[in-house]
Amino acid sequence: MRKLRQNSLMTSATTPALGVIGVPKEIKGDERRVALTPDGAAELVQMGCQVLIEHDAGRGSGFSDEMYVSSGAQIVATAKEAWSAELVLKVKEPQAGEFDFLRPDLTLFTYLHLAAYPKVATALKHSGCTAFAYETVTDRNGVLPLLAPM
């Protein structure tokens, strides 16, 4: 994650300029990854964000709830609470059980693969949310860094 200048992001001592970020547990079969590590959560908290992590969202990737709490994130009990954030970070495209969480004031960052999942495209369109597909993010050279092998 690129470091942003903190003083340009804060609007006041009590109001985070970047708002609330939610990380729900992935529900797609066999998906164990999580969209945000505890270190990433700590960086966002330091920039003034409130970070909501659904209980056990990081467990499949080896991150405990306690690790997120130590980073300054808050653990929430339900997906609904994580999805209530202004910005939601996920790994996989929204599943049918998550479509009701999509709404006009939501920004979603995740892999979308819309050509393979037309029902997701339809749900996103009808919800009015703003969605960014990781697989389409390019750098200055036109390279797709989020598709590079880890």
Language model features by range: what are they?
Residues 29-38:
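Glycine- and acidic-residue-enriched helix-capping/strand-helix junction motifs
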Residues 90-91, 111:
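Short, well-ordered coil/turn residues at beta-beta hairpins
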Residues 22, 41, 45-60:
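Short internal beta-strands
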Residues 2-20, 26, 96-150:
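Glycine/serine-rich phosphate-binding loop and adjoining beta1-alpha1 elements at the start
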Residues 52-74:
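N-terminal beta-loop-helix "entrance" segment that forms/cooperates
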Residues 49, 73, 129:
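Short phosphate-binding/catalytic loops that engage adenosine nucleotides
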Residues 72-84:
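Short acidic low-complexity segments
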